[in-house]
């Protein structure tokens, strides 16, 4: 009798232990399949970087770094303002915030391959860009227009002058893609404004066809920029076409003061 009672106790204990194990296992599976919000199993929701990246609204001051070619340097403007200083002045008025131009890193004649190399190797370049919350950029014109400019320098113009522009497009766009990728790696939170290209030779019959290639450039550049939440493109094509004499300087390539003023106004419209 005692032996039977002992076996009954052991059997009851085993059943209880098994039930406890099954309940625990069931709870574990439930937690794995249906975790509640307070548990570590729920990953943090991603930040809305697409809408907030590059926003200047919450900044106490605007810190500008400009880079690129002679257009950003302001070549052709006899006042020395270019578009960069005019953008800064306009932002002071529209935002009522202090606006500082930290650096203008533009270099006359700079090409996409040269800028890509600087961004990749020049730590001083990268350091300056990291301090900005607004980056202004022009690049690509020297790559595409060098053939036409050479032929325009005291030589007879011909339709062949624009053939080089079309041939340069693919390689220049590839380098442009590298540039904006590197810019994003250096500073993913700053608003980056790329100023689109225009055809400075629109009023010359033999070179007017270049407008078609310039439009291709602008469209493809926009497509590349669209991949980054903090980058925008400001078109300038329509600002000069048909108005070359009014808004280009004597070199027939760079804007004059009023031309840069129109570019600055377009940039301000895109930022406000």
Label every PLM stretch briefly:
Residues 179-212:
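Active-site segments of SGNH/GDSL-like serine hydrolases
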Residues 200-235:
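Substrate-gating cap/lid alpha-helix
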């Amino acid at each position: 009798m005692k032996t039977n009672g002992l076996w009954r106790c052991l059997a009851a204990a085993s059943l209880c232990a098994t039930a406890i194990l099954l309940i625990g296992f069931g709870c574990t599976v439930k937690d794995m399949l249906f975790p509640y919000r307070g548990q570590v199993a729920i990953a943090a929701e991603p930040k809305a970087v697409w809408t907030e990246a590059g926003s200047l609204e919450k900044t106490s001051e605007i810190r500008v770094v400009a880079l690129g070619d002679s257009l950003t340097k302001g070549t052709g403007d006899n006042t020395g303002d270019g578009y960069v200083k005019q953008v800064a002045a306009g932002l002071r008025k529209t935002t009522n915030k202090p606006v500082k131009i930290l650096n203008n890193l533009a270099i006359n004649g700079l090409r996409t391959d040269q800028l890509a190399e600087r961004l990749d190797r020049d730590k001083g370049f990268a350091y300056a860009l990291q301090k900005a919350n607004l980056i202004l950029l022009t690049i690509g014109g020297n790559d595409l227009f060098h053939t036409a400019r050479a032929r325009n320098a005291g030589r007879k113009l011909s339709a062949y002058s624009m053939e080089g522009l079309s041939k340069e497009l693919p390689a220049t766009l590839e380098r442009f893609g590298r540039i904006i990728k590197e810019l994003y790696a250096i500073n993913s939170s700053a608003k980056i404004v790329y100023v689109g290209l225009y055809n400075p030779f629109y009023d010359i019959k033999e070179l007017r066809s270049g407008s078609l290639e310039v439009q291709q450039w602008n469209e493809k550049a926009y497509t590349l920029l669209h991949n980054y939440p903090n980058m925008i493109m400001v078109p300038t094509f329509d600002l000069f076409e048909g108005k070359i004499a009014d808004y280009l300087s004597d070199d027939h390539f760079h804007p004059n003061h009023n031309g840069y003023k129109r570019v600055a106004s377009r940039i301000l419209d895109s930022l406000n």
